[in-house]
């Protein structure tokens, strides 16, 4: 059996009134899911802990699949996760994450975003929101019927595409402050992990429709 190498990143920053507990729970669930499972090796990083940028680059290069767990603060990832990406990806310039922006001075108008060094790898992202899922889907509601992946996480997805990685279907947790149900969320997430990594349902999804199916959860 081919071994899949999984690198898990907890972006649930402890800051202000946020204790980061929800994403830490999801992060721990991911590690527990893969630990001891035949066919998987796992490494993990919590952005709240000290990290060595060179070692983090090695983790990206080592991994077949990167899993990000992040809350959304003010419609963006937390500043601690953004700093982690800035520091680690800068360290990874020409050392494993990206070589260049892909363009040449001879023809600078084309091929932007094709200089990544992580081709052949995949990533998955989960996000947690105070906003209910209806805020994204109902006419007249706040997000103008724009999904998480096509809206707030659009830049995050393009960031990973810049490195050469391809997406796996993710999962988004809504209304986690005023209407949380952690038992249901964990059951739904474990089912998602089984579907993606054990049953491999994603292999039957086309690249054109994976995000719509992922955000429907």
Residue ranges with predicted function:
Residues 8-12, 127-131, 171-174:
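Short loop/turn segments at strand-loop or loop-helix junctions that form parts
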Residues 52-156:
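Helix-loop-strand module that forms the ligand-binding subsite of alpha/beta enzymes
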Residues 37-51, 171-174:
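A short beta-strand-loop structural module common to alpha/beta enzyme folds
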Residues 1-2, 118:
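Short, flexible coil/linker segments at domain boundaries that flank nucleotide/cofactor-interacting
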Residues 2-38, 202:
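N-terminal beta1-alpha1 ligand-phosphate binding loop
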């Amino acid at each position: 059996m081919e071994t899949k190498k999984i690198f898990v990143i907890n972006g649930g920053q402890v800051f202000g009134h946020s204790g980061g507990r929800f994403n830490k729970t999801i992060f721990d669930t991911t590690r527990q899911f893969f630990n001891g499972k035949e066919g998987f090796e796992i490494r993990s990083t919590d952005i709240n802990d000290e990290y060595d940028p060179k070692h983090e680059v090695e983790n990206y290069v080592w991994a077949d699949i990167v899993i990000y767990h992040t809350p959304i603060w003010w419609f963006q990832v937390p500043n601690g996760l953004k700093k982690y990406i800035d520091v680690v990806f800068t360290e990874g310039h020409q050392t494993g994450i990206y070589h260049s922006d892909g363009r040449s001075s001879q023809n600078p108008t084309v091929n932007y975003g094709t200089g990544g060094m992580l081709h052949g790898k995949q990533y998955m992202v989960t996000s947690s929101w105070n906003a209910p899922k209806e805020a994204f889907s109902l006419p007249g509601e706040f997000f103008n019927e724009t999904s998480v992946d096509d809206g707030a996480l659009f830049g995050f997805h393009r960031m990973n595409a810049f490195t050469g990685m391809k997406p796996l279907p993710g999962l988004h947790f809504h209304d986690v402050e005023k209407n949380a149900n952690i038992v249901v969320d964990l059951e739904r997430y474990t089912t998602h992990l089984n579907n993606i990594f054990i049953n491999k349902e994603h292999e039957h999804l086309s690249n054109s429709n994976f995000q719509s199916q992922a955000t429907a959860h």
